[in-house]
């Protein structure tokens, strides 16, 4: 196993590093000789395998909740690095490390204002450094990653990130740069419709932050051109898309409380088999039995069908409506196949464990949980396949 010892510029003057155009952004690599720095006592061991997952979405679209569900599938709660910056955006568990791509902003809040660009604009982000560091982590090499401070809007000193078993990069641009995109083992896009996004933002910003309706509308409109140009097109590259739409069960519903959620799964993705309802490849419309699944108005409806999405063959599983009792979800789970669960009822168990998470009574929570289980299965298949390949190479 290779060993990498990582030092900051202050710790050691050395020419053995990869660097971007800014001298403060460096990835230090020491592969052969284990070293110990007495001041920092930093000895980093490379992970045997690191797989990289990309999660793209606009701000306020549920990325944080999704990450909490995903890390829970692998066990253990994700927390900021111990002893590090209290404003760090990074979350670390025993198996996963989640990096927020806001940390690769090249302009702080004041710089963006001066340059008249939003954080969605590629000119406000350092894709060279993003690529270098994601590649390094994927190859088992620790990095000194910058921190974007969401409280102050400034760029803080970097933090040391060690290579995990599973690296998740989440934010606005995980699939924007082709070099970064090619490093991903699996990718997800959260596609929230304009109507639902507006309803959610009103609920959050008016109720929790005291913003006016006019300011909320202005904020959404100001971001929309850059969102349409730089963020939304990434969904064509995603292996799975969770699409959140207004319900069709309530005519002219504008509140965004009852949702129609579609899980769009690309066919032919290595180590990933789409989930299906009843019969794979068929077109199914299903209203569950009211005696087995308690649902208040407007009820609940599932659909499943093969389809095409950006010229790719996909399978689409849809849920419209919401649950009243999560323990009854086992009835729905029993009719779904290819869930990649370890035991009967694992989806229901995961949903009950996080019943207080947003979306736990509708398709957003259900499909996030399912995708988390599929990612676990993908990871296990990847590791097993690489182990087999190594064994065959030695034979």
UniProtKB/Swiss-Prot annotation:
Pfam families: PRK. Its EC number is 2.7.1.19. GO terms for biological process: reductive pentose-phosphate cycle; response to cold. It catalyses: D-ribulose 5-phosphate + ATP = D-ribulose 1,5-bisphosphate + ADP + H(+). Pathway: Carbohydrate biosynthesis; Calvin cycle. SUPFAM superfamilies: P-loop containing nucleoside triphosphate hydrolases. Keywords: ATP-binding, Calvin cycle, Chloroplast, Disulfide bond, Kinase, Nucleotide-binding, Photosynthesis, Plastid, Transferase, Transit peptide. GO terms for molecular function: ATP binding; disordered domain specific binding; phosphoribulokinase activity; protein homodimerization activity. Belongs to the phosphoribulokinase family. NCBIfam families: PRK07429.1 (NF005655). This is Phosphoribulokinase, chloroplastic. It comes from Arabidopsis thaliana.
């Amino acid at each position: 196993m290779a060993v990498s010892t990582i030092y900051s510029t202050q710790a050691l003057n050395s020419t053995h590093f990869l660097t971007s155009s800014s001298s403060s952004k460096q990835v230090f690599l020491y592969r052969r000789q284990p070293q110990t720095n007495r001041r920092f006592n930093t000895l980093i061991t490379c992970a045997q395998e690191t797989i990289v997952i990309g999660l793209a979405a606009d701000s306020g679209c549920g990325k944080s909740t999704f990450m909490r569900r995903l890390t829970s599938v692998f066990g253990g709660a994700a927390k900021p690095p111990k002893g590090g910056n209290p404003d760090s955006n990074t979350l670390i568990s025993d198996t996963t490390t989640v990096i927020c791509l806001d940390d690769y902003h090249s302009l702080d809040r004041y710089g963006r204002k001066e340059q008249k660009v939003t954080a969605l604009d590629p000119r406000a982000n350092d894709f060279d450094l993003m690529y270098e560091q994601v590649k390094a982590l994927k190859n088992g090499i620790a990095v000194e990653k910058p921190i974007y401070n969401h409280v102050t809007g400034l760029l803080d000193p970097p933090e040391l990130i060690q290579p995990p078993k599973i690296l998740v990069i989440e934010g606005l641009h995980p699939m924007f740069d082709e070099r970064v995109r090619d490093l991903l083992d699996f990718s997800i896009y959260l596609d929230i419709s304009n109507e639902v996004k507006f309803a959610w933002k009103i609920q959050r910003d008016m109720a929790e932050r005291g913003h006016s309706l006019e300011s909320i509308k202005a904020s959404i409109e100001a971001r929309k051109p850059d969102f349409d140009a730089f963020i939304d097109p990434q969904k064509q590259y995603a292996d799975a898309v969770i699409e959140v739409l207004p319900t069709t069960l309530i005519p002219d519903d504008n509140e965004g409380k009852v949702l129609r959620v579609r899980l769009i799964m690309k066919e032919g993705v290595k180590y990933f088999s789409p989930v299906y309802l009843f019969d794979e490849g068929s077109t199914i419309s299903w209203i569950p039995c009211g005696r087995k699944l308690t649902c208040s108005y407007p009820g609940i409806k599932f659909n499943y069908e093969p389809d095409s999405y950006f010229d790719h063959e996909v399978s689409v599983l849809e849920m419209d409506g919401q649950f009243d009792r999560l323990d009854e979800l086992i009835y729905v789970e029993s009719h779904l196949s290819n869930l990649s669960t370890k035991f009967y009822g694992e989806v229901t168990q995961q949903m009950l464990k996080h019943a207080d998470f947003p979306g736990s009574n509708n398709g957003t929570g259900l499909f996030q949980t399912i995708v988390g289980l599929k990612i676990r299965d993908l990871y296990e298949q990847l590791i097993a396949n690489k182990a087999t390949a190594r064994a065959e190479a030695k034979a």
